[in-house]
Amino acid sequence: MKATIVFLLLAQVSWAGPFQQKGLFDFMLEDEASGIGPEDRFPEVPELEPLGPMCPFRCQCHLRVVQCSDLGLDKVPKDLPPDTALLDLQNNKITEIKDGDFKNLKNLHTLILINNKISKISPGAFAPLVKLERLYLSKNQLKELPEKMPKTLQELRVHENEITKVRKAVFNGLNQMIVVELGTNPLKSSGIENGAFQGMKKLSYIRIADTNITTIPQGLPPSLTELHLDGNKISKVDAASLKGLNNLAKLGLGFNSISTVDNGSLANTPHLRELHLNNNKLNKVPGGLAEHKYIQVVYLHNNNISAVGSNDFCPPGYNTKKASYSGVSLFSNPVQYWEIQPSTFRCVYVRSAIQLGNYK
């Protein structure tokens, strides 16, 4: 009886299943020899089934997270666990995403491909990712946005690439999209198709900063709450370009070349709370601030503003229903602070919220 028990224990040790990582930072392989010499012979037994999916070599797998970052990979690893929810492939040397690279990853929610050398993505590469919500492709060499992105996608970040075109067709059917980040690309206004973003009914956040665009993109969706266009070459704010943006709460237009803000522009954004127009070429305070009901933060520093009127920011009189300002910056403008009437800021919440300074 004892001999039988010893035989079974030895058989289990000798024919152990293949290596499986049990934790995110567990790279240690158990000793496969287990003290059994080559002269030992046992009858053949069926190979034990692995307890779970294999983890790609050198990657770390834990709780449906597969981390393969900073490994010098030049292609997507094979045999990825089918239950993977987050796949991190950032900081590698991958040059191409091919059809079949993500096959069987039907549970993937987040795909991180930041800081690779990707210049080509096959049209059907993302087709198997039927639950993908977040796609990070920043710091690569893409010239166009990928085609046939999953309809479940909510967040797309593709800044610091070589994108020159944004076609309306690439966003068709992406009705769940909330965030689009396209900053730091050699993109021009002519490269953005009119109404390219219009079909995304839930889109809330767009950032197209540090590009070569000269105008605010046309046909933006009314669902937008944040629009960041800082660091471009925009010279004028057109009232028509902001028409219909009834839900916009934050507008970033700093570090452009804006000299004019059309009358009525701010009226087209009735729920705007924060306006960044710093580091431009404005020679006066934009019209419409005093009548705007909700705006609370206005950045106008580093412009060419030489005078500030007593009704530029607040409605006439002290009995006003306008929301109080919590921040107004006017420093680094030609206007001298002692030339501004104290009543100019009668609707500012606290005096410390006003930033004035000498022009340099």
Swiss-Prot record:
LRR repeats lie at residues 74-94, 95-118, 119-142, 143-163, 164-187, 188-213, 214-234, 235-258, 259-282, 283-305, 306-335, 336-360. Keywords: Disulfide bond, Extracellular matrix, Glycoprotein, Leucine-rich repeat, Proteoglycan, Repeat, Secreted, Signal. PANTHER family: AGAP008170-PA, DECORIN. Glycans are attached at residues 34, 212, 263, 304. May affect the rate of fibrils formation. The attached glycosaminoglycan chain can be either chondroitin sulfate or dermatan sulfate depending upon the tissue of origin. It is found in: Secreted, Extracellular space, Extracellular matrix; Secreted. This is Decorin.
